Every structure is written in C-alpha cells, then in structure tokens.
Regions:
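Paired small-residue
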Residues: 97, 108-116
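Residue-level signature of mid-helix packing/kink "hotspots" within the transmembrane helices
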Residues: 36, 64-72, 156-157
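Helix-loop-helix hairpin linking two adjacent transmembrane segments in secondary transporters
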Residues: 148-167
C-alpha cells in the first residue's frame, strides 16, 4: 500500500451519506435533549423526590461527570473500532441510563442514571465528526459539522416546551 492509499478517505455515495448523517444527527439531537432536560423536569423532580437546588445542580452535573469520564478513551476507541460501532455501543448505555432515570425512586438512583446517560451520549458528537472526516470531502465536512451543531441546538429546544407538553 502506498502512502496516498492510506490517506485517501473512503467517500460515501450521496444517498448513503445522507443516511449516515441523519442517523448521527438523531443521536446528537438525543444527546442535547438529554443534557438539557433536567431544567425542564426540575419542578416535577423537586416535588416527587423532595429535591433542593443543590440536588438539581448535582443531577445536571452528573451528566457532565459521566460525559467527561469517557472522553480520554473515546478517541482511542473511535480509532480502533470506528465511529459506527462506538456510537451504537455508547447509545446502548444512554438508553439504559434513560430507563434507569425513569425507574429511579431516590436521588441516588437519579444521579447514577444521569452519570450513565452522560457516558452513553458522550460519543454522539465526536463519533460523527470522526466519521465525517473519514467519509466526506472537506467541503462537505464543513456543512455537515454545521448541521450537526444546529441539530444539537434543536435538541436543546426540544427539551423545553415540547417536553412540558408531554408532562
């Protein structure tokens, strides 16, 4: 193999690129929604679990604790296993975290679930960016990265009034 062969990305056909983008964008939307939903759920959490502001802050921080615990090994896992496998594996932890959060009957259960959610969604931005670097040309990467960030913003918006309507 020549050096040129090693550095040439495997560009995806257009249809497959759209499917890959939509799958990754949905995961990042979910990540942003889970990150921001604690604020929307706070009135319910305050009453049902008798929490105070400090507890709510710790719940919000639990997400970031879980998120940060995986960041150093995440790069190695992305390089070794690829973005598709890594994001699927991580999202399974996010689903478990969301289920655990819904079944929690104590503050400690909520906190453990938030940490698990944070760990689970921690690959939802870096995995797509890694995949886009591998599979898209440079001009397409700029657009897809921008659209990904917009999708995350929509996830944060979805965690507000739409979630309140569902409650």
């Amino acid at each position: 193999m020549t050096a040129a062969t090693l550095t040439t990305p495997d560009h995806l056909p257009r249809r497959m690129a759209v499917v890959v983008f939509l799958a990754f964008a949905l995961a990042y939307f979910f990540s942003a929604l889970v990150r921001a939903i604690t604020a929307t759920l706070s009135p319910t959490l305050l009453t049902e679990f008798s929490l105070n502001a400090q507890d709510l802050g710790l719940l919000a921080g639990g997400y970031f604790l879980g998120f940060s615990l995986t960041q150093l090994p995440l790069g190695r896992w992305l390089d070794r296993h690829g973005p598709k496998k890594v994001v699927l594996a991580f999202l399974s932890f996010a689903v478990l975290g969301c289920l655990a959060f819904s079944w929690a009957d104590s503050f400690h259960g909520l906190l453990a679930a938030r940490v698990l959610c944070g760990m689970g969604v921690s690959a939802c931005l870096m995995a797509p960016l890694t995949g886009y670097r591998r599979w898209f040309d440079a001009s397409t990467q700029l657009r897809t990265n921008s659209w990904m960030l917009m999708t995350g913003s929509l996830g944060m918006l979805a965690a507000t009034l739409p979630v309140q309507w569902l409650m």
